[in-house]
């Protein structure tokens, strides 16, 4: 029999996260800051904002159709300052970096399908049919019972480590740290249950006059130990802190960053499948973003209601059509009812048309920049609409009625 996550006596899984100062994450935050600024003034704007950052230069580009005006260079510098790139010795800072913009309007060919869906063109009058999907593609959502936030443990811990790394920099606990950084966690599973942490990896950018030994001791004490549960650590857990021995040059000085380069960091750390579309800089008519959020919302509520311990949902769309082409689920042999019944519950309680998703989750609001670092999903410290468990009671009631009818 093949060895799988659920039946293997020893199964290692690794996920990574990055800090807000990572070059790719700088770009995600800038793109979402532009989106938030526009959607706050014009909720129906169409935004596809991409950012590139390199040594001394930020380029913001994309397709934006809106009735409002925002000062993009000012937004860019504000994000860079908030992240912590404020010192010239970093080689990149908010005051001296160049900012270039190249913005066009959304293609009229795309607007034909988004502004008026195929269903609306055929004469149907349901207002939720009016908005077509902004592109073709497939989107995935996932939830599991490993953590209180229904996320896989490896990515949950990796995000918390990266966030802690930024916290100890900003609050002065480890004032020698610089904004760039990464984390990686390997969890050892036994028959589908997390048993121990096999290894923890931290990359922390730092000032040049700090010894490797001090950094390693400080990071283990101030970052790793406060985050990783002690019952998952043992004498064989391996710690790697700045494994090359030095991480002074970082951020856009050492690596060019782009929006959308950290799609697994943004989602489930590789634990679930991914359709390939990025989130940041996209308004909610782009199903790459809104349908992934909705799929997470569905999966989380279904798992919280007890339908399965692990559940992945796939939704697929075609550009200009409101209704999804397909909806499918995978429960990894943990379901407590048939897949047919689960799909009927999804159909009963969740409307997957883009306009319905936007309205039900309240997505035409400036809520996106806060998601652009440390994950779009899970995030118990944020009140994200796709993380709410407000469908659990209704799902349980339907489960009971289905059981009675059989």
UniProtKB/Swiss-Prot annotation:
Q: Which Pfam families match?
A: S-AdoMet_synt_C (PF02773), S-AdoMet_synt_M (PF02772), S-AdoMet_synt_N (PF00438)
Positions the record marks as coiled coil are none
| Protein name in UniProt | S-adenosylmethionine synthase
Protein keywords? ATP-binding, Cytoplasm, Magnesium, Metal-binding, Nucleotide-binding, One-carbon metabolism, Potassium, Transferase
Q: Which free-text remark accompanies the cofactor?
A: Binds 2 divalent ions per subunit. Binds 1 potassium ion per subunit.
Q: Gene3D superfamilies recorded for this chain? A: 3.30.300.10
Tell where it localizes: Cytoplasm
Query: What PANTHER family does the record point to?
Result: S-ADENOSYLMETHIONINE SYNTHETASE (PTHR11964)
Q: Cite the record's note on assembly.
A: Homotetramer; dimer of dimers.
Family recorded in the similarity comment: Belongs to the AdoMet synthase family.
Q: What GO MF terms are annotated?
A: ATP binding; magnesium ion binding; methionine adenosyltransferase activity
Glycoprotein is among the record's keywords: no
Q: Report residues binding Mg(2+).
A: 24
Q: Which organism is it from?
A: Dehalococcoides mccartyi (strain ATCC BAA-2266 / KCTC 15142 / 195) (Dehalococcoides ethenogenes (strain 195))
Gene Ontology terms: cellular component: cytoplasm
């Amino acid at each position: 029999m093949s060895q799988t996550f659920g039946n293997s006596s020893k199964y290692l899984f690794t996920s990574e996260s990055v800090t807000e100062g990572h070059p790719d994450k700088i770009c995600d935050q800038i793109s979402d800051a532009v989106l938030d600024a526009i959607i706050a003034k014009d909720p129906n704007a169409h935004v596809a904002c991409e950012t590139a950052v390199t040594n001394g230069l930020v380029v913001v580009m994309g397709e934006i159709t809106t009735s409002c005006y925002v000062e993009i260079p000012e937004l860019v510098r504000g994000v860079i300052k908030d992240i912590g790139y404020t010192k010239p010795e970093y080689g990149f800072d908010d005051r001296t970096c160049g900012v270039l913009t190249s913005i066009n309007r959304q293609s009229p060919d795309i607007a034909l399908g988004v502004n008026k869906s195929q269903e609306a063109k055929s004469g149907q009058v349901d207002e939720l049919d009016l908005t077509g999907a902004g592109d073709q593609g497939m989107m995935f959502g996932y939830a599991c019972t490993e953590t209180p936030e229904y996320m896989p443990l490896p990515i949950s811990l990796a995000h918390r480590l990266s966030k802690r790394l930024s916290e100890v920099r900003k609050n002065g606990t480890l004032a020698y740290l610089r904004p760039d950084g990464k984390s990686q966690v390997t969890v050892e599973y036994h028959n589908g249950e997390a048993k121990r942490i096999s290894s923890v990896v931290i990359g922390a950018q730092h000032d040049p006059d700090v010894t490797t030994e001090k950094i390693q001791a400080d990071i283990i004490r101030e970052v790793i130990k406060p985050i990783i549960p002690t019952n998952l650590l043992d004498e064989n857990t391996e710690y790697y802190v700045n494994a090359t021995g030095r991480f002074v040059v970082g951020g856009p000085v050492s690596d060019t960053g782009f929006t959308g380069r950290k799609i697994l960091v943004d989602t489930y750390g590789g634990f679930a499948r991914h359709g390939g579309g990025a989130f940041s800089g996209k308004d909610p008519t782009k199903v790459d973003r809104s349908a992934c959020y909705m799929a997470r919302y569905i999966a989380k509520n279904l798992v919280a209601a007890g339908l399965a311990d692990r559940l992945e949902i796939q939704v697929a769309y075609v550009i200009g059509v409101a209704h999804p082409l397909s909806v499918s689920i995978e429960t990894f042999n943990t379901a407590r009812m048939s897949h047919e019944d689960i799909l009927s519950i999804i159909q009963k309680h969740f409307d997957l048309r883009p306009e319905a998703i936007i309205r039900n989750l309240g997505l035409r609001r400036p809520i996106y920049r806060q998601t652009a670092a440390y994950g779009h999903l899970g995030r118990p410290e944020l009140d994200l609409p796709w993380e709410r468990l407000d469908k659990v009671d209704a799902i349980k009631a339907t489960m009971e009625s289905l059981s009675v009818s059989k």
